[in-house]
Amino acid sequence: MHAFRNLLALLLLTLCAALPLSAQDEGEDLGSTEGALFLLLPVGAKAVSLGRAMTPLDGPESAFWNPAGLVAVRESQVVLLRGDPLAGTSTAFSVLWAHPGLGTLGVSYQLLDIGSQAITDIDGNELGSLSVRDHLGVVSAAAQLLESVRLGVNLKIVQFRRSCRGICPDAGTTATTYAFDAGLQILPSERLRIGAMLAHVGPRYQVLNADQADPLPARARLAVAYNLISLLTDDEELGGWLSVEVQDRLLNPGSLSLYLGTELTAGVAEAIFLRAGYVLGDLDQEDGARVGLGFRYERFDLSIAKSLAVSTLTGETEPVHVTFSIRF
């Protein structure tokens, strides 16, 4: 137990050491364009259906949100996450190792395939193809520090890769950086959860050269969740959580986003989940409603989500997001 907590403390100290450098870099030009914006895209069907109001909540998708929520993962499992945001096709997975009484460790990966473009000569003959992809690797650690306090950290490797097959004007571009997340959850009672976190904190993201490096989209999040159903019944197999979350830029505040999420649950070992959410004022997403369903049966969990917000660019809604997990 002490070794696990020491690991968390070491990761947090590393994060604190990185914060001053990051703040100095971003403070030099607060109006600069942020890099690696794919980090702000929602990952996971539960997160999509709850309108991103994930900071006070728990579950396996927390590896891509507030890592403190991984404390509630009591069984080791493999999680597959699939979605098609406007930016491209997102495929991700997590492997989580749960240690009751100690905490949870996780390794996750996300691939965002932005697409490919054929390279042709003046006669229209295809010479090669240019593909653009974003990669994200995450190592997570979470532990219960006190009876009602959870702590989690993520160490992330972020990479942009533009590669060529065949004959291309250039050989391609690769940019790599690192980032940290640090999250906290406080449970004053069984009905109430409070969450806070810093997300995507790290050095500037250099794609071409140092002069054109952009700051990462660092964010501060604060949220609260309350089980409203507990006011009506003491039945532990019924739940009705309402989550409210606010988000702002970490070092250039003033652009608040509001996320609302509701989750109705029936059952424990085998359960069904009805979810709905709303995004308001988010600079990185379309405002509007989201809905979703979840099922838990034996060792399997399946969640499906759909955004009802219509894109101002395409005039359409996003396809369905799916999360599937197997416990072992």
Regions found by a protein language model. Give the residues of each.
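Bacterial N-terminal signal peptides
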Residues: 9-18
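Sec/Tat signal peptide C-region and signal peptidase I cleavage site
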Residues: 19-23
